[in-house]
């Protein structure tokens, strides 16, 4: 708390006054990070976009967000080390994820009605898969580079992974 207070140019007592505890402060930080992601996702208007292009734009948007905001992934990784202790205590975070899943559900439904997408696609599971494809490369970029000698934060590598991940998602979605 002392380091946080110094960086915020305040004192520990003020932090405890506003947040109550280290745990409540961390929960507030998580909620803030997820709110920023949700606000960014809300700005993405995919209503009139063809379903295949809408899924592609949503995926690229999320993956680019992760790349531009690796602090979100660090927070989530830290939370996973704590077995989601703080997220479990926050109803707000669960509520924040719902709008993008609802947006994706509408896109999937439009694609199904157009005869493009399979009918048995669960929006939440698809979102988790979509998210995971972008998450892994950003979250693990340092160990991937050390292990394989490839810098996945470099534009050329990133573009190749995005292309492959997009093809994977669409291959799963498309009616066979």
Regions found by a protein language model. Give the residues of each.
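Amphipathic alpha-helical segments used for helix-helix packing
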Residues: 68-91, 141-148
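Generic alpha-helical structural context detector
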Residues: 27, 31, 35, 64, ...
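All-alpha amphipathic helical-bundle segments outside canonical DNA-binding/catalytic cores
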Residues: 53, 92-96, 113-129
